[in-house]
Amino acid sequence: MMIMFFLLCSIIFVVTIIIFRKQKRGKKRNTLPSPPGLPLIGNLHQLGRHPHRSLCSLSHRYGPLMLLHFGRVPVLVVSSAELARDVLKTHDRVFASRPRSKIFEKLLYDKHDVASAPYGEYWRQMKSVCVLHLFSNKMVRSFREVREEEISLMMEKIRKSISLPVNLSKILVSLTNDVICKVALGRKYGGETDFKELMERLNKLLGTFSVGSYVPWLAWIDWIRGLDCQLEKTANDVDKFFERVVQDHVDGNRDMTDFVDVLLAIQRDKTVGFEINRVSIKAIVMNVFVGGTDTSSTLMEWAMTELLRHPKCLKRLQEEVRTICKDKSSVSEEEIQNMSYLKAVIKEALRLHPPLPLMVPHESTQDVRLGDHHIPAGTQVLINAWAIGREAATWGPDVEEFRPERHLDSSVDYRGQAFELIPFGSGRRICPAISFAVVLNEVVLANLVHRFDWRLSVESTEDQTEVAESTGIAIHRMFPLYAIASNTT
């Protein structure tokens, strides 16, 4: 009996020494600042309701490069422009992949889309289809008539409610949905309640946290709270919808060429040198919806919020637009090119309110060094675009202030070359639809301030317009933006 006891104690002692030495070697090898976590869950409890804000606060204490653990998963958090450059440019290829995600795999056709597909040949092929065939400058210009028609309908809707409170948040979401529907699918689905409800479910679930993805032995929590059931139902409903859309295009003759038509033509004619199947078509089209509708409407919503909170900025923008357009009833896309203050307003809104404050996670595919730190393969990377937009070293002491003037004499742009402002990402994983999104945002905002004078409605209190944010993958206002339009004087 004593021998067995002694043997057991010896085994425990040896195992303890081995574990201790491994941990010690790991600490010597990786000296990254790391907030203390809890057993099993790591730092998950520190994310809070708004992770981009919580992680920004932690970075003020632990630095712009810190290592957290979400359950068993090591997560590197980047909160400065300089370090974002290292990840997205210097070591772009190493960090170009995406981590596994139960939610993305279930909702995005097992990651056959462009945004969540792991780095590799399939992703390169699908990215080239998007860049060359869907979001080329030629394609963006070809849908100008769609943008003009939908903006005209929006302006008429506002005109009919002149001097009455209008829900600008709802109007902007509707406009964006209608434009994306016509461009991607060939017709509008915005009036269909089932479609609206489905897209709301999809966007909400994409921003939902899955416990099981980070703490596998707690995966039962996802089942208990109904997440697994919601994912299954929504994935099936989404697939049925897009399958019906694709089949309608296969069966019918259409006058206008939309994204589905383009993808089907590529599949039929084999013009890209590789095969594109039905699943890939549906996944890419869904990417357009997820990446286009929520993010564009969010940016316009926040831009109008800030302009209404800062009447002097609104007045200066109106003066610029009205000076260039004079008595014209609408603003054209050519005239936008001469509106420097409008572009500054868009940049400032993107700085303070990036639609995706935490960029879609990256993952290292091999060991790499960032400065003096060793980053092992398989490390997830979260780039906090929201925190980078508030770096005092870059933007000055007034980082929390909405001041478009800061961009007028600045070369910083949002197209991925300046890492101080990366709302659309950078490097290999940069959003391929930047031009499409920006032209819509600019022309909508210009027309809103050209045609009408605006003031906040009593339904939108000062507190609501200031800081209240929703939760989800794209950060909207928590409360709808109500404003009152009046005819220009």
Swiss-Prot record:
GO MF assignments: heme binding; iron ion binding; monooxygenase activity; oxidoreductase activity, acting on paired donors, with incorporation or reduction of molecular oxygen
The UniProt record lists the keyword GTP-binding: no
GO cellular component: membrane
Pfam families xrefs: p450 (PF00067)
Cofactor: heme
Keyword Oxidoreductase: yes
CDD domains: CYP71-like
Coiled-coil boundaries: none
List of residues binding heme: 431
UniProt cross-references to Gene3D superfamilies, sorted A to Z: Cytochrome P450 (1.10.630.10)
Residues annotated as transmembrane: 1-21
Disulfide partners: none
Membrane topology: Single-pass membrane protein
EC category: oxidoreductase
Keywords, sorted A to Z: Heme, Iron, Membrane, Metal-binding, Monooxygenase, Oxidoreductase, Transmembrane, Transmembrane helix
Subcellular location: Membrane
Taxonomy, superkingdom: Eukaryota
The EC number(s) this enzyme carries: 1.14.-.-
Family statement drawn from the similarity comment of this UniProt entry: Belongs to the cytochrome P450 family.
Protein's name in the database: Cytochrome P450 71A26
Annotated organism of origin: Arabidopsis thaliana (Mouse-ear cress)
